[in-house]
């Protein structure tokens, strides 16, 4: 299953103190094939990141997010999670097939 996650972080010393541990954690998830893409969101008033996960289910995703150093240090001020079915593009071969619409 694919999930698109956004994380918003408060500005402050905590972000700078824990950003390298966060990046190392994300790199580990990339190596494991669980995090497929990630990066900062540009042009927003607060620091934010977008992450695309490919995991077995929502429970696995929740556990991965909970283990992120930004989460353990209380540095996620807003989190959104959307289950995503990438029918077109780079991840399409891994999408869940859906039946085509019936014609009238």
Question: Each PLM stretch: what is its role?
Answer:
Residues 1-104:
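Conserved, structured core segments of small domains
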